[in-house]
Amino acid sequence: MILINVKYKVRPEFVDTFRQEVAAFTDATRAEDGCLFFDWYRSTEEDDVYILVEGFKDDAAEAHVNSEHFKQACVDMPKLLVETPTIINTLIPGKTEWDEMAEFKVEN
């Protein structure tokens, strides 16, 4: 699995509508072969910060960055942002899904 976390600092005028602004990109990415998850989260400490958590099968990330919707997002997103996003990109060989946390269990 390729696990990617991207931190976006959003312009004040787009803070409340950011998810709608990126909805088409999000939907198109989630429909890609090899996309395991593509989930947005808003910081509870910084109102203008959104985190994108992405997971792709090992061979799917290249197709993602070469897709038309990714190329369009690279044109559209900068106008929504205060600064260039920061990213953590990690290859986890053999991984395809989330694991249960080992440190404790929730009994149902």
What is each PLM-predicted segment?
Residues 41-48, 75-108:
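Glycine-rich beta-strand-turn "strand-cap" elements at beta-sheet edges
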Residues 24, 28-36, 55-89:
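An amphipathic, aromatic/His-enriched active-site/gating alpha helix that lines ligand/cofactor pockets
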Residues 2-9, 39-65:
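Short, well-ordered beta-strand segments in beta-rich or mixed alpha/beta enzyme
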Residues 10-15:
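Short, surface-exposed ligand-recognition loops at beta-strand->loop->(often short) alpha-helix junctions
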